[in-house]
Structure formats: C-alpha cells, structure tokens
Amino acid sequence: MAQLWGGRFTKETDKLVYNFNASISFDQKFYEQDIRGSMAHVEMLAKQGILTAEEKDKIMEGLGSIMEDVKEGRLAITSEYEDIHSFVEANLIQRVGDAGKKLHTGRSRNDQVALDMKLYVRDEIDAIDGEVKNLLKALLKIMESNVQTWMPGFTHLQKAQPVTLAHHIGAYFEMFRRDRGRLTDIRKRMNTCPLGAGALAGTTYPLDRAYTAQLLGFDEPTRNSMDSVSDRDYVIELLSALSTIMMHLSRFSEEIIMWNSNEYQFVEIDDAYSTGSSIMPQKKNPDIAELVRGKTGRVYGALMSILTTMKGIPLAYNKDMQEDKELTFDAIDTVKGCLALFTGMVSTMEFKKDNMEASAKNGFTNATDAADYLVNHGVPFRDAHGIVGQLVLKCIELGTSLDHLPLAEYQAISPVFQEDIYQAVSMKTCVEKRTTYGAPGPEVMRQVIQENIKYLEEN
C-alpha cells in the first residue's frame, strides 16, 4: 500500500479502511492535470532557489516520462497506490532518486487536489463548450433551410399559432447559446490558482504563487488559503450548468419523440440513430432521444449529491470532499456523450414538411389573425376575441376551418368580414406579417440567422 503518510502511526492501516479511503480508482482520471501541476510547481521552486537547476531538470524529465508512459499504456495506474498523487510521486522517486523526494516541498495534497480538480474542470468546460457549439452549428443549418417551412406552434401542447420550423429550432438555439454563456462565466470565475495554499494556512517557503498561476494559465492566485482548499463552488456551478444543458436536451428529446410518432409524423429519425424491437418487427424506436431524456436525472442527481455533501462541512478541507470526483466525472462524461449523439441525431433527421404544414392548417392556429383582422377594421380587441370564438364554434359545427368557412357564415357573425379575410388567415400571411424582432416572419428570421452565423464565427 503506497501512501504519502504514516510516520506517526504504530499500526498498519486496516485493509478495509485503506480501500474505503483510497481514491486511485477514480482520481487517476486526472493524471495529466496532476503532472502538469507538479511541473509548474517544480518550475516555480527552481525559480525561487528552493530546487537546484539539476534537481529541476531531473524531476521535469521524470514527470514527463511518467506522463508519456501512462498515455502510451506502458505504465499502469494500479490500486497499490492510495491516490494519483502517491502514484506520481512514487514513480518519480523510482526514476530520479532523491530529487523526486523534493517534489512535494511547499505543497499539500489539499492544494494539490484542488489544483488538479480545477485544471480538469477547466479542460472539460472547454470540451463541453465545443460540443455545444457543434450542436448549435447543426441547429443553424436546419434553420437556414426552413425559414418558410410552416408548422403549428404550441402552448399547453395545444395548437396555438403558426410558426416556422426555423423559428421553432431557433428557440433551442437560444437555449444552448445561453448554456455556452454559463460555461464561459463559470470558467472565468473559477480561473484562480489554489496551488501554494498548503494544507490550509499557506507555507513558510518563499513561493511565487503568481508565477505558478501564470504558468498554468490562471488569471491570479486565490486570495485565501482556507477557501482555496475547501472551495467546490465551481464544481457545483458546473453541475448546475450541465443540469441545465441536460434539461434543454431533454425538452428537445421529448419533442422529437412526439414528432417521430405516428400521431405527429413531423420527423423521421435516421436508421443509424434508431433501434428496433425483439418481438415487434415493425418498430423503429427513438431510443437515443429517450436515453438522453432519461440520463437527465443522472446529472441532476450529481448536482443534488454534491450540494448535500458540501452543506455541512466546516472549514477547511474534509475527506467528504473526495466524493465530488466520481459525481463530476460521471456528469461530464454523460453530458459530452449526450451532446455528441444528439448532434448526430438532429443532423440526420428528415423533416416531413408537408405534414407540418397540414398540421398547422388544422386546429385554428390562424384564429388570432382573424381577430387581428377585425381589430384592423376598428373592432376593439376584446370584442374581436369574442367574435372569433363564435366563428370557431361555427367551424366545429360545420366540420370546416377558418380558411374554408363560407363568407356568408363570417358575415352572419360580423358584417365587418369581407372577401379579403381568406388572405388574412392563410398560413403564408399569418407567418409573413409577423415581422417584429424575434418573431417567425421570414425577413426577420433571416436577420436572426445572420446574427447567429456571426456569433458562431466570433465565439
């Protein structure tokens, strides 16, 4: 059992205790971050005269070889080590001798693991941001091709007003764009370096914390050593942002599942992103969308777990905080996987435009436009609302729609209606006259698409 402590103990650690306490099975995931942090620490120690140039070169060469050997599969990370820190240090000493024993000068595992976690989270934020950007590109492509693809817009899952597919997909574009903004905010706020905080009270060595922070790409060192080793706000913020991403993916998945059903027939998911049934030969199931929807709860669970873990911990570091790793690793991997699969699925879906348009023409989605027609002819809106309600009842009675209701029936309810009512309630007119910024009208929709293109080019 390789561990970095034990001098004051008179008994061996119980095997069950060792296994319960060890974290090597999961914190090996950030071996690269651990070695990068150690390299920066060594550079700083040499700069400050705490290590000689020869010691620095030996240690740097040893750390580099460990990184390369693990990456290439020549060196296995095994359970004989308590954690990734002891694995790296033990292997370093084996390779470079006594110089390796100086690696931990001016450092505690408390600030070391805080650094590793920050480096890992920062790297993964960049990776997740890239996956969200890929999804936005796929959505933008759909928007560009469907500025005049009419479909019903819904409220309460009831047909409400006609919109376009570009406009509907654009709503999700906005959601995922905000998600990128949240990731950017988290990255900026967390970008302070905890290395040099020690166990909780700093160190007596003349460390240059600003130099270490600069080497590792941080904006500055953290400002309080106790907070440095006990801060997991950035983990909580990340899991919150990931939960929001999953919520957006889940909402979109729910719509795709409905749209893919025989009852809607708005889309057909590509065979490559569908599965079948072991008993029903006709089935083509939207399993990817369903799994994305299901995995949302998994990410929510990680957020609630870390909030619960942190709520009762006194300052500064406590072993409870080891529980943040597996939760965070799993949530990150889940979100990255869901984003990649979802992007592939939406990129290959076939939109059944004729069915969408036919659906928009049913369900009185143009009723509001009939009311607006009356308002434009001097009828107060509240009166117009009541008149169109009567028209809808008449259409239901006759089994027809506002597009095909005879003019005599219109005029029997209100003499204001004239022949031009049919143009006013056509799908084309209903959508095209909605020209306020953010509405589905083709002209303003094209403007938004150009803004989205510019956003993706610049971000």
Model features per residue range: what roles?
Residues 38, 66, 128, 132-135, ...:
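Amphipathic alpha-helices that form helix-helix packing interfaces
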Residues 127, 131, 157, 161-171, ...:
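Short, contiguous, pocket-lining structural segments
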Residues 2-37, 98-99, 280-459:
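Glycine-rich cofactor/substrate-binding loops
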Residues 51, 75, 264-265, 380, ...:
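Conserved hydrophobic residue
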Residues 1-202, 207-213, 220, 275-276, ...:
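A helix-coil-helix interface module used to build multimeric assemblies
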Residues 61-69, 232, 390-394:
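A short structural micro-motif
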Residues 145, 182-185, 189, 218-222, ...:
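Conserved helix-loop functional segments at active or binding sites
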Residues 216-308:
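Acidic, glycine-rich loop-and-beta core segments that form the ion-binding/anion-interacting portion
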